[in-house]
Structures are given as structure tokens and as C-alpha cells.
Amino acid sequence: MKKIIFICFSLLLALTGGCSMNDNDKNSTNDNKTEAVKPKDMDPKDLPQVPAFQDEKTREYMVSTKEEEPGYYLLESKLKGFRMLFPEDGKYLSRRSSLTGKNKESIGFNSYDKDTNVMFDGHVTYYKEESFANEPKTMLDIVSGKNDYKGEYKKSSKKKTDIYTAKKKDIFDDIDRKYNYSYSYFGYVKSTEEDNLGVEYAFTLGCKNENQPCSLDEEKAKNKVEKLINSITFLIDKKEK
């Protein structure tokens, strides 16, 4: 199973161009305001010179050209269901993304840090008006199955969400490669403000190029992932309530 996971991750890197729970309540993910002219409608020359804006598909999700934190901008789902921080070097992956009606949306993306030789792969799925989304145990069983995980999840709570998180380190002993490991973080963010509303997430970090030094640090990986998880904010239409 580990060998299959590693091969899948390696293929993902090749196909994509070689390819702490901190409190972020003050982050503007809680602010529904947007720019008068959206980034997707602007001239790329006037946008930040980073992949998140220079990639045509990715900038469709960008809320503003304002940097929320150093290296991070604000992403909004196509269904306008949630917002979260997005790395400036992140790029949207169409083959791992989908839009299903008005109640489900998946967004896949990745980023590559040339300085550290670390590839970051992310995938989030938004659920609305789905009864199973209101059952953390059911959702975590689904997440565990997708990530070949049999352990427990850590729960934390913010003002309007409950966050469930698990992590694991995969070491691929049967692969002849120097950097034969990766760190994965996955779980579920459930709205406590509205029923049947949540976001499933999975993030993996691994070394991309075997013939280059790699600085994959577990603490830095955890901090990066937790920053994104904690930034997830649901956009609830009060008129519907």
C-alpha cells in the first residue's frame, strides 16, 4: 500500500511541472468584501508576479491582490461556500478539481519551493446540505479510508468551526530513493454555525527531485498546513436562513 501511495505521489509531481493550531480569526477570511475588479478580470501584468495570479485558472479563485500574510493570498471557492489562505506559489490542478451541482466542490492544487526542493500537494472538498457532512465520525471514516489511516484525530474548536486533524509520516523502504518519505495531514472542518456544512482536506509534502538536496522539515510542514486549515472560513448566506 505504501509503495502505491509513493508511486501516486511521484506521478503527481511529474505531471505538475516536475511537479500549532494558530488562531487566524483576525484573518480577513472572515471578511466577505472583495475588490471592485476581481483579479481574474485584470491584466496579468498588473497582478502580483506569482503563480497564484499568473496562472489563468488559479487566479479565478483569488479574491484580492492584497497579501493576507507574507506569501499568502485569499482563495474563494466557485460556489462561494468558503474561503481560505492560499500560497503565492500555488497552482490549481484541473484534473483533481470538480464542481458537482450546488452542494459539492473539490479544489486540487500544488506548489513547489525550489529553495527547499519540497513539493506541497493540497486537496479540499466542500460539502453543503449533505446530511453526512453533519456527522464527524462518518466524515472521518471517509477521510481515513482515502488516506489509509487507522488512528485517532485531534479535535480543536474555533468560534464557528470544529477542526479534526490527523497526520502521518510515510517511509517507503521498498523504494530505491534517498528522500523516500513524505508527511501527510488530513481531516475535516465542520461548521458549528450551520448544519450539514463542512470541508474535507488532505495535504502532503514530499521531496521532488532526488538529485537535489531536500529540506523537508516536519515542524515547518506542520505549521504550513495548520495555517491553511485554521484559515478555512464558511461563507453563510444569512438570507437563506
Curated annotation (Swiss-Prot):
Q: Where along the chain is composition biased (Basic and acidic residues)?
A: 23-46
Q: Which PROSITE patterns match?
A: PROKAR_LIPOPROTEIN
Instruction: Cite the positions of N-palmitoyl cysteine lipidation.
Output: C19
Q: How does it sit in the membrane?
A: Lipid-anchor
- Superkingdom classification of source: Bacteria
Report the leader peptide range.
1-18
Residues with lipid group (S-diacylglycerol cysteine) = C19
Q: What induces it?
A: Up-regulated by DegU and Spo0A. Repressed by AbrB.
Taken from the UniProt entry, a GO cellular component term is: plasma membrane
Q: What does this protein do?
A: Required for complex colony architecture.
**Would you tell me the protein name for this molecule?**
Putative lipoprotein YvcA
What organism is the protein native to?
Bacillus subtilis (strain 168)
According to the entry, what is the taxonomic lineage of the organism?
Bacteria, Bacillati, Bacillota, Bacilli, Bacillales
- Give the gene symbol: yvcA
